[in-house]
């Protein structure tokens, strides 16, 4: 994220609307589809704003090599990757520091939600491929990954759902756009398990006051109610389609 005080880009207009016409607490359009990869144990595709991300889940299976096994529970290995064509400037192939950090925090968030104790010595691989990037890819990828895990039939305590909020032109806004992410004052990605309210991912880039932080997190929690329903609808739609096809 680029934070610059010299930037003169105005991100909020005189009508208190953002550059894309949204109000402060309005989400970008979100579409999720489950079961999109035939050879994966579970999969999902998400479009969130301009983001396009596909997720494949493989496992639980015996962890290999054996020294990577945990005798008490499964190990969740998320691999987040941005395709070379996913951003305007061509990205060098292979993992970098950012993708490794995002892979780690997604692995930890998913591990909190999965009943990993049911699968000792196993591993669950989660491949997250960003086909098109438009701000908030870690949260969009995580939100799709939990749908893919459910599609794989892996038992979970709850599905993980997240969103971002941030500070733009002095205002707290929900679900940052690419321009807001690049030129805003702060970005706060957050993910929770809705049933318990447990926070499984929370980061911040930039500066906000304590009141602004609570405003941002409250805005995210409210938004997750809508996103959670989109997740569940994706799974219901998949099984509805399978039921129709099975009855033919």
Swiss-Prot record:
Entry GO MF terms: 3'-5'-RNA exonuclease activity; RNA binding
Pfam families: RNase_PH, RNase_PH_C
CDD domains reported in the protein's UniProt record: RNase_PH_archRRP41
Compartments, record wording: Cytoplasm
Keywords recorded for this protein, A-Z: Cytoplasm, Exonuclease, Exosome, Hydrolase, Nuclease
Protein EC: 3.1.13.-
Enzyme class: hydrolase
A cellular component annotation (GO) from this entry: cytoplasmic exosome (RNase complex)
Gene3D superfamilies: GHMP Kinase, N-terminal domain
Example of a GO biological process term: rRNA catabolic process
InterPro entries cross-referenced by the UniProt entry: ExoRNase_PH_dom1 (IPR001247), ExoRNase_PH_dom2 (IPR015847), ExoRNase_PH_dom2_sf (IPR036345), PNPase/RNase_PH_dom_sf (IPR027408), Ribosomal_Su5_D2-typ_SF (IPR020568), RNase_PH (IPR050080), Rrp41 (IPR011807)
Record NCBIfam families: ECX1
Role noted for this protein: Catalytic component of the exosome, which is a complex involved in RNA degradation. Has 3'->5' exoribonuclease activity. Can also synthesize heteromeric RNA-tails.
Assembly with partners or alone: Component of the archaeal exosome complex. Forms a hexameric ring-like arrangement composed of 3 Rrp41-Rrp42 heterodimers. The hexameric ring associates with a trimer of Rrp4 and/or Csl4 subunits.
Matching PANTHER family: EXOSOME COMPLEX COMPONENT (PTHR11953), EXOSOME COMPLEX COMPONENT RRP41 (PTHR11953:SF0)
Protein family according to the UniProt entry: Belongs to the RNase PH family. Rrp41 subfamily.
Name of the protein this chain belongs to: Exosome complex component Rrp41
Native source organism of the sequence: Thermoplasma volcanium (strain ATCC 51530 / DSM 4299 / JCM 9571 / NBRC 15438 / GSS1)
Lineage summary: Archaea, Methanobacteriati, Thermoplasmatota, Thermoplasmata, Thermoplasmatales
């Amino acid at each position: 994220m680029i934070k610059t005080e010299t930037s003169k880009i105005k991100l909020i207009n005189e009508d208190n609307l953002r550059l894309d016409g949204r109000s402060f607490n309005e989400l970008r359009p979100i579409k999720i589809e489950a079961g999109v990869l035939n050879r994966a144990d579970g999969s999902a595709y998400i479009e969130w704003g301009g983001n396009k991300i596909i997720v494949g889940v493989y496992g639980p299976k015996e962890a290999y090599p054996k020294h990577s096994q945990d005798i008490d529970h499964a190990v969740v290995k998320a691999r987040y990757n941005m395709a070379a064509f996913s951003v305007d400037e061509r990205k060098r192939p292979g993992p970098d520091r950012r993708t490794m950090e995002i892979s780690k925090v997604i692995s930890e968030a998913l591990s909190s939600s999965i009943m990993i104790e049911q699968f000792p010595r196993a591993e669950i691989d989660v491949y997250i491929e960003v086909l098109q990037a438009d701000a908030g890819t870690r949260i969009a990828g995580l939100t799709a990954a939990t749908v893919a895990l459910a599609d794989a039939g892996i038992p979970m305590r709850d599905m993980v759902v997240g969103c971002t909020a941030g500070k733009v032109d002095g205002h707290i806004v929900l679900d940052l756009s690419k321009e807001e992410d690049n030129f805003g004052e702060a970005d706060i990605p957050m993910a929770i398990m809705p049933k318990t309210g447990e926070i499984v991912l929370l980061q911040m880039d930039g500066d906000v006051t304590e009141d602004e932080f609570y405003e941002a997190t409250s805005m995210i929690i409210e938004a997750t109610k809508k996103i959670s329903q989109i997740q569940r609808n994706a799974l219901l739609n998949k099984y509805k389609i399978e039921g129709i096809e099975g009855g033919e």
